[in-house]
C-alpha cells in the first residue's frame, strides 16, 4: 500500500510485475524450469492455481487505486510442453480489464501478442533481431518494449561487473522504438 500511495502522490504510474510461474505453490503445474525441484507432482492442479492467481490479481487491482500496467512473466516455463499449455489468458485479461479498464497488459511470453495485450515485449533483444533466440515473433503494431539487464544477470550478483555502456543502452532503446 505504501508504494501505491507514494506513486499516486508523486504522479508516477504504478506498474506491477506478476509471475505466472510459481515454484512454491504445490498446485502450480511444473514446467521445464521446476522439474528438478524434487516437488511432488500429485498436487498439481491448474484450475486451483488459476483461481489463486485471479484472487491475487483482484486484490492488486482493487486495493491499491489505479494500476497502469500488469507485466506478466514466467509463461515461457511451459513453452516446450508436448501439448500447448492453456494459460487461459483471455479469462485473466478480461478480469483485469473489468477491474481496471485503463490497465495495460504486457506478457513476456516470447510469442506474438495475444488478444487483450497492449505491449509487445522482446526479451534481451530488439524487434526484428532475435540475437538471443527468444524473440523470433513478428513485430506487431502495438507499442514495443525491450526487456534488458544492465549487466549479465536479472538479479543482484556481487561479481557481475559487466555493465552495458551508455551507448549500448541508448542503441537498445532507439532500436526498440524504431
Please annotate each region the language model reported.
Residues 1-178:
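Mature catalytic domains of secreted/periplasmic carbohydrate-active enzymes
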